Amino acid sequence: TDDIFSDSYPTWNKNGEEIAFVSDRGSYVDGEFFGRIEEHNYSQTDIYIVNINNAKIKRVTNTPDNESYPIWANSERTLFYTSDYNGVYNLYKHKLVETSKNDSALNEAYAITNVLTGLQQPTISKDDNSIIFAGYSGVGWDLYSLNNPLDLESKKIEPTNFINTRDDEDLTVADIRDTDKIERIDLNTNSKYSKW
């Protein structure tokens, strides 16, 4: 790519002719961008594929959510990636089907995980039998595996409370240096919460 948009997390498909990647380009997949970048929503990302033989870019996802970390399956034309659809990054499966126009259809992707704290950086085994990813648990990040990801059924995930109420809440930034606004925790109570 050679434009003003941010492109990241490139990953080759098995035959080496396509690269899936993450971008904030929105609908700008060909031609020049004549708008003003400060008026472009560069905070939202989708998954795209570029064919290295003709440099054509195809948009795979088109959601208001942030998709990231695409990885190709090796035995079929399927992408896995993370999405924060419900406010937490879960793993999604997206089978790509060729249409008569030789474009990847925007098939509906579906979640194959429903985690509480999010996951990142998935990678798939050569035989497609396992996906390893980083997930947050307790006080840090750990590695987890998911067996037979191509065979997993859709998981129903509900939007988190943050997503359900994000338009209702005051999300203004507070200056925490103003000590009058800081809630103090009494460290001498028998609270069920950690002092850390």
Where are these predicted regions, by residue range?
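Outer-membrane beta-barrel initiation region
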Residues: L150-W196
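Short coil/turn segments that connect the beta-strands within blades of beta-propeller domains
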Residues: N15-E17, S75-R77, D127-N129
